[in-house]
Amino acid sequence: MATINQLVRKPRVKKVVKSNVPALQACPQKRGVCTRVYTTTPKKPNSALRKVCRIRLTNGFEVTSYIGGEGHNLQEHSVVLIRGGRVKDLPGVRYHTVRGALDCAGVKDRKQGRSKYGVKRPKA
């Protein structure tokens, strides 16, 4: 426990919390334009072709975002919404595209977990 005199001389230092998603600038989502849509391979021990896109955000940042779900309709110049959330086996991918918002369509024929993939409730 520090004495009052010690605290007067050198006050306690607040810990600075570093953001995991700096490009969002404390916003829940951001809009951007796809500059490149491509696939990439995950790091060991996983193996796949993960769908990702490079996005220029409205605030000028350029980020890589993961496209979740089976199949997508994104191409260059598509306008998308991104949210935070990294992909553990893709280094440098710290954002997810929001399915079913702006130019990004929802996942076709999705029956369960629909809200995460932008799919409306199917007709009975």
UniProtKB/Swiss-Prot annotation:
It comes from the Bacteria. The modification 3-methylthioaspartic acid is found at residue 89. One of its GO terms (molecular function) is structural constituent of ribosome. Gene3D superfamilies: Nucleic acid-binding proteins. It holds the Pfam family Ribosom_S12_S23. The keyword RNA-binding applies. InterPro entries: NA-bd_OB-fold (IPR012340), Ribosomal_uS12 (IPR006032), Ribosomal_uS12_bac (IPR005679). One of its GO terms (biological process) is translation. GO terms for cellular component: small ribosomal subunit. Keywords: Methylation, Ribonucleoprotein, Ribosomal protein, RNA-binding, rRNA-binding, tRNA-binding. With S4 and S5 plays an important role in translational accuracy. Interacts with and stabilizes bases of the 16S rRNA that are involved in tRNA selection in the A site and with the mRNA backbone. Located at the interface of the 30S and 50S subunits, it traverses the body of the 30S subunit contacting proteins on the other side and probably holding the rRNA structure together. The combined cluster of proteins S8, S12 and S17 appears to hold together the shoulder and platform of the 30S subunit. PANTHER family: 30S RIBOSOMAL PROTEIN S12 FAMILY MEMBER. Part of the 30S ribosomal subunit. Contacts proteins S8 and S17. May interact with IF1 in the 30S initiation complex. Belongs to the universal ribosomal protein uS12 family. This is Small ribosomal subunit protein uS12. The gene is rpsL.
